[in-house]
Regions:
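N-terminal pre-domains immediately preceding structured catalytic cores
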Residues: 2-190, 194-245
Length: 245
């Protein structure tokens, strides 16, 4: 699998601006920012998390090119709902970490172990999208054809879902879509930045494992670091409060 990057750069940190731009630009226009050399014994991924002060609610994407070069359809994906982050594991190491927007409270994304059932480069929803009347005027930009059939002579235009990777029998999957860091926005699907969905689409095949979990997955390599940072932040806030008289 090839990525449009300098071959000498093995670990990449894609900035939030580049992630947003990628949703509007072609793959050839995507921008990458290299992670600087590691210090104090930290791994590339640990440094990515450490430097992202507001992680996990950030738009930055992490990619380890050396690990991604070894990724196969037997690699697995974890979607952590509480963090609103996704991770690709290769050889039990985090090869990529990215923001997601999963199902809103009214349409929660189901948890559990899944496998990719089907993938399609160009796909459109058969349930959600725009509804037009017989005159061709858009009368509903967020139509749900299961709840309200279109008018006579009208037509339905399903919402585009590029790089579609289906996971469940009732239509939940992963695809390119609007992502807002830390926000659950979808009708149940897992929305991905376009640069990420393109990368994953090239890796996954029928049967690739995808684990959707509410909490951080077992073996998450920076769990201890995250817990310690939360303690330190709580202590800092406590010290900043004015003492009671």
């Amino acid at each position: 699998m090839k990525h449009p990057v300098n071959k000498s750069v093995r670990t990449l940190w894609i900035s939030a601006a580049a992630v947003l731009a990628a949703g509007l630009a072609s793959c050839s226009q995507q921008q990458y920012v290299a992670v600087t050399p590691m210090t104090q014994g930290m791994s590339a991924y640990e440094k990515f998390v450490a430097q992202s002060k507001k992680y996990p609610t950030v738009m930055e994407v992490y990619m380890d090119e050396a690990l991604l070069a070894r990724a196969t359809s037997r690699s697995h994906i974890v979607i952590c709902l509480s963090q609103q982050r996704g991770r690709l594991y290769v050889d039990n190491q985090v090869a990529a970490d990215w923001p997601v927007s999963t199902g809103a409270d009214t349409h929660p994304t189901p948890t559990g172990p899944y496998r990719v059932r089907f993938k399609e480069k160009t796909h459109a929803s058969n349930r959600y999208g725009k509804m037009y009347n017989a005159e061709g005027k858009c009368i509903d930009r967020i139509a749900d054809v299961c709840k309200q059939p279109g008018p006579e002579g009208g037509r339905f235009e399903g919402s585009p879902m590029p790089n579609w990777m289906r996971l469940t029998s009732d239509g939940v999957g992963m695809h390119t879509g609007k992502v807002v860091a830390g926000k659950r926005l979808s009708h149940g699907c897992i929305r991905l930045p376009h640069v990420v969905s393109t990368m994953l689409f090239d890796i996954v095949e029928y049967g690739t494992r995808v684990i959707i979990t509410e909490d951080i997955e077992p073996g998450y390599p920076v769990a201890a670091f995250m817990a310690q940072r939360e303690i330190e932040e709580a202590e800092t806030k406590a010290e900043a409060r004015p003492s009671a008289l």
